[in-house]
Amino acid sequence: MIVTSMFRGIACRCELQLLLTPRRMLRNFSSLEQKQSPKIESLPPEERGKYKVATIPNAICTARIAATPLIGYLVVQHNFTPAFVLFTVAGATDLLDGFIARNVPGQKSLLGSVLDPVADKLLISTMFITMTYAGLIPLPLTSVVILRDICLIGGGFYKRYQVMSPPYSLSRFFNPQVSSMQVVPTMMSKINTVLQITLVALSLSSPVFDFSTGANDVIVGLGCITGFTTIYSGLQYASGKAIKKI
């Protein structure tokens, strides 16, 4: 009996060691993730598009992100004309990817709901920083815009962590099939985005078209309104009104 118990104890310890090996643990986590994640093939056709990654709007957003450093570099170098042209094209692509996502079946995705505002914020933040460096936008307004965006990004990551269920990993964190959530812009946020883009476009075109003093005064007034909407929409996001768990 004693010998049998010893062999059983040794066998149990060996089995436990096998289960706790790194490779086996990763395999167990992977199988658990597969059980907790919905299979795209098992979803209705109208639901499958939400989990797509390779969509036309996502490709357009990626191109806009890739072009952002070039536009910022042109502003820093005071090459305002090509910077204005590229910024106008980037703004047009923002409208284009939104139109495609809303009107073309299978092109609206959860990744796009996050990637599109990230691309917008990256472009706008880059423009505000570089245009402040070039003397086109005042530093206090840029500080408000950048601080709001940093808080939104940090809050978005924290909210994503909150809606996730264990086990926690980077692959599951960025997997749209795991505890999905969607960012829904508020009306004030949409107005703020339009005002920010308009302010950047007018400020950037001022040295290109040599605006008069009166036109520059209008830009200053627009900057004050933009500062207010930036703060107000940031408070709306902080309250969680723009985050929806799916």
Curated annotation (Swiss-Prot):
One of its GO terms (cellular component) is mitochondrial inner membrane. Keywords: Lipid biosynthesis, Lipid metabolism, Membrane, Mitochondrion, Mitochondrion inner membrane, Phospholipid biosynthesis, Phospholipid metabolism, Transferase, Transmembrane, Transmembrane helix. The keyword Membrane applies. Belongs to the CDP-alcohol phosphatidyltransferase class-I family. One of its GO terms (molecular function) is cardiolipin synthase (CMP-forming). Its EC number is 2.7.8.41. GO terms for biological process: cardiolipin biosynthetic process; regulation of cell population proliferation; regulation of mitochondrial membrane potential. It comes from the Eukaryota. The lineage of its organism: Eukaryota, Metazoa, Ecdysozoa, Nematoda, Chromadorea. It catalyses: a CDP-1,2-diacyl-sn-glycerol + a 1,2-diacyl-sn-glycero-3-phospho-(1'-sn-glycerol) = a cardiolipin + CMP + H(+). The chain crosses the membrane at residues 80-100, 127-147, 191-211, 218-238. It is a multi-pass membrane protein. InterPro entries: CDP-alcohol_PTase-I, CDP-OH_P_trans, CDP-OH_PTrfase_TM_dom. It is found in: Mitochondrion inner membrane. Signal peptide: none annotated. Its main location: mitochondrion. This is Cardiolipin synthase (CMP-forming). Gene3D superfamilies: 1.20.120.1760.
